[in-house]
Amino acid sequence: MENVITERLEALRTELRREHLSAFVLSAEGSCWISGNDKAEGIAVVTQEDVELWKKKEYPTLTAAIPAIAEWLQEQFEKKKFQSPEIGIDGMQTSTADVEALKEQMKHRGGITIRTNFDPIERVGKNNPNPLITPIKLISPTEQTTQKLARIRQELRKQHADGMLATRREDVAWTLNLQTPDETGGKAAESYLLIASNKATLFVDSRRASNEVRAYLATQGVEVKEQKEISKGLKDYFEYNILVDPDEVCYTLYKKITRIVVFGESPITTMRGVSS
């Protein structure tokens, strides 16, 4: 296992040199891949010389670790260990709030800039076995999706929003009466629910959506599209504005939005908590 970790680190560092990045803040998925463990032990930052780990016990989330990460990166910068004043973080795996917080921290720590449009793990991990594609399963609802969507839209109006993007797995599953997906499913398990005033669209890996699931969602007024079409879906979103929960929606998708953004807490999370 030690040899595997060494090989993976070298492959990652090769990609960082190619992209002129001095460091990379790994997502939970990336940390798992580097360590070879199924579950991340913490948040890892990789440079050309070091690997620093902020253990999950002390820093349960990236949000909690950002000040410590920023301080450590500044120390590396001051020791002239960085050839480039730019570091990377995967914008598809990091919330808008966390990216903005890290950018703000680094701006005042030597002017280090953040790049979010690059995922080195996706490049160097191509020879890994594909993650298990678990099919979506329906659950017996106590409330139909049409009713939930009506209540969600009512709450959105209270926040002066015409629609919203839901990306939290539990929220998407609850709204659509689907079984909550396994956290170990990686990017293949991600799904996005785009809600407008008169339509809703689920963007999901098509291999996971059976005909039964598609048929049920169609009766509930929910269209199913391929996961990778989410960027186009946000571009084509026709409402005046859209609600974005910065603690939920990833930075990359937030930057794809062309309409006015209303920042606020997702009403789905609150509704789900009340119903459970």
Predicted feature descriptions by range:
Residues 1-276:
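Terminal domain-start leader segments
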